[in-house]
Structure formats: C-alpha cells, structure tokens
Amino acid sequence: MTDFPPSTRRRFLASSLAGAGALAGLSSFPSAFAADGRKTDTLRLTWGFTGLTFIAKERGELEKTLAKDGIKVEWIGPFPNHAPTLQAVTGGTADVSFGGSTTPALAAIIAGSPLVFTQFLVYDPRTTSIIAKPDSGIRTVKDLVGKSVAVNRSGLGEFLLVAALEKHGIDRSKVNVVYLNPPDAAPALASGKVDAWSMWSPGVDIARVEHNATDVFLEGRDLDFQIDFTSYLTRRRFAEDNPSLIRAFNAALKIEADWATANTKEAEHIAQAKAGYRDEVRDHLISLKRRYTLYPVTDQSFVTELQKATEWLVARKVLPEAVTVADHLARV
C-alpha cells in the first residue's frame, strides 16, 4: 500500500488547481460568514452513474425544488468515482462533490485541498463487494493470496480489501493490489488482467450478470462494522460565502433521499434508463430496497463515528496521516 509521500500530495493539488477559481478557493478565509446569504445563484453539482445524486439528476425534481429559492443547478460530469469530483471542486470547476466515499475526501483534505463536508449519507444494505470470475480459482478471501485485486486508491474498494484481509489474518503484502479507477477495472476483470475487483454497486452487480462473477467478501454480509460513509463536500470559501445555498441544497437532497427510499422501483428504473445496464441488474437493485439516510454536519454522534473510522484508516495506512474531521465541516 502506498504511503502518499509529499510529492503525491503536491501532484494532487497541481491537478486540482488547474481549474478556474482555484486561487480564490485557496485564499485566506474571512473571519465572518456571509450571514444567511449567498454570493451566487448557481450551484454546480457533479454527477456519475451511481448513487442518490445520479437518481436526483435524472428525476429532475431537485432542480425544481432549488428553483423555488432562486437557485439554478448546473450538472458537471459524468465522473467515474468520487476522487475526480473532489479535484473538480478543489479547482473551482464545480461546487459540490457527487456524494461518494469519505476516504478519498479525507485523503484530499490531508493533501491540502480546502474542502469541507456539507452533509453525510448512509445507505443500507451495504453492497460493496470483492468479486472474482469463476475461472479465477478464487472462492474465499484466503484464495486472494498471490492474486491481483483491483481497487480504487484510498476509496471504498481499498478499504474493503484491507478489512477483508485483516479479518482473515492475511498480510496485505501477500496480495497484489492494483490501483485502477472503475472504468479501467471493469474491463481488466473481464479480460483476466486482474483476478478480483473490490467495487460498489452497480459495478459489482453488472459483473455478476455479464461475467458470472461471484462474491468473495460482501460488505453487508461479511463485515460487522462500517468504516466508509458517503459524503458531500465543497470548498471552504464557497460554504462561507454561500451558507443559505448549501442549506437549500442539503434540504433538497433530503427530499430526494426520502423519495428514493420510498420509491425503490421507480428510482432504479430511472437510474437504469441512463446507465444502460441489463434488466437483471436493475431487478436485483430493486430487490435490495435500498434506504438512504442523510446526516447533517452538526450531528455530533455521526462525526464522532467518522472520526473513529478515520483513525482506523490511518492506523492501516489507507490514509497517510491523522486528520480531525471536526476541523473540516461546513458551518452553514
């Protein structure tokens, strides 16, 4: 596992700062917030082919809700996973990340990105899984020894692999960890360039249908604790300048979460129409009856749990150094 040397952190910032508005995002923060106001009526939201934000985008109601407050939504994307959206937000080409793993968000903050959490999301059941094709010879976690496993760096995939190996007493050095983003990992698994893949829905669900992949370690079944959560982030300066806008977005997304929880079948049909996966995948996702629960950054109990999770990740070098979550919360 990589220990994220300072040069890596500089590269992250260099790529992020290429976007417009980066200098404003990194300038000194004002001592007083733009009380109850906002300096823009436009909110640029990132999106990808998964998750609550994707469903909200395709449903089209979130824009209508925010329009009642005079807020115009612009969609930036698609993005393959959370980390690139964090770079877009850091660089100023987008305003809010699309709701992804807290782990790359924490890694970006450690690397120096001026990001703050605006809210958190927990979905249930947890469906992230380490999967392998039938011809891989992998049936159990112990079979991963000497094999290659694709994961997204400092993300949900890497966390699950680390947790699975630890639970079964396997040293990480005995597994060949291959860092790939989802668009590259899926064909790598299909072609046999990697032996297994640690991934979330719908990627794992598609692989089960198209390649007869099976679960080696399923988060909701095989792990009795949760370390990684879903999170939304913006630039610290943007939150300070636009507290009412962030509050309005949080409230609008709560409406979407409640709707998606109560209307699983319709939500999954909406997602499939854009993502284009098979009906078998859609029907499996419908059967999960996924529930979405949002937590505000003012929820001290949740923040405490996230801090414990952060320390777990630091101890296992998934994150390179300690970070205090409470120092990186939007004050809106």
Model-based region annotation:
Residues M1-S7, R11, S16-L23:
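N-terminal secretory signal peptides
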Residues G21, A32-F33:
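Cleavable N-terminal signal peptides
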Residues A35-I170, N176-Y179, D195-S201, Q226:
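Short, glycine-/small- and polar/acidic-enriched structural segments
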Residues E63-I71, R221-D224, T293-F302:
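Short, solvent-exposed loop/beta-turn-alpha elements that line the ligand-binding surface or hinge
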Residues T103, P183-A273:
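Pocket-lining segment of extracytoplasmic ligand-binding domains
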Residues L121-A132, A213-F238, R291, A326-V332:
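Periplasmic-binding protein-like
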Residues E240-V318:
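Secondary-structure end/capping motifs
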Residues T310-V332:
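Conserved C-terminal helix/tail region of periplasmic/extracytoplasmic solute-binding proteins
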